């Protein structure tokens, strides 16, 4: 629903030249549905950069604002330095506010655009798990070779946690 609203706001418009709009779909399924519904093309045509569905923005990787710069974020990761810039001004906002602000170049209230239309969600959401690798059967686990470069170390062996934490 959020991506439908964002596409509605951006349709036929161009992101402000002083703004870098990056969109990170939450999963490969969301990205596929955005493509199927024409949303992806609308976002790209408006000037949005589409990021890989992976741990990126929420771990502070990529799209770091300049020192003292402002960044609007629509995901729930917000603490000092999380954006990758220790003195960045990071604001948590709705996708609608982020999209409209990307057009204007400043913090803008999307209600200025008027009422949003009623969006109809698909009856069925696509699920495509073809890239998920399931664990080997237990009887074959000893045969699985984990390939590591010289800078990747295995997890340290630790004792099980106690039943309670004091």
Give each language-model segment a name.
Residues 1-166:
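Fe-S-dependent hydro-lyases/dehydratases of central metabolism
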């Amino acid at each position: 629903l959020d991506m439908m609203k964002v596409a509605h706001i951006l349709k036929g418009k161009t992101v402000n030249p002083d703004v870098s709009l990056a969109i990170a779909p939450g999963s490969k399924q969301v990205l596929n549905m955005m493509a199927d519904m024409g949303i992806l093309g609308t976002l790209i045509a408006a000037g949005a950069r589409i990021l890989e569905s992976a741990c990126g923005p929420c771990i502070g990787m990529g799209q770091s604002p300049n020192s003292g710069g402002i960044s609007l974020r629509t995901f729930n990761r917000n603490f000092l330095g999380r954006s990758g810039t220790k003195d960045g001004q990071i604001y948590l906002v709705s996708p609608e506010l982020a999209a409209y602000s990307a057009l204007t170049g400043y913090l803008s209230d999307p209600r200025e655009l008027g009422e949003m239309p009623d969006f109809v969600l698909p009856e069925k959401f696509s699920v495509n798990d073809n890239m998920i690798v399931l664990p080997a059967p237990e009887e074959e686990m000893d045969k699985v070779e984990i390939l590591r470069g010289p800078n990747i170390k295995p997890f340290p062996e630790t004792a099980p946690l106690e039943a309670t934490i004091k």
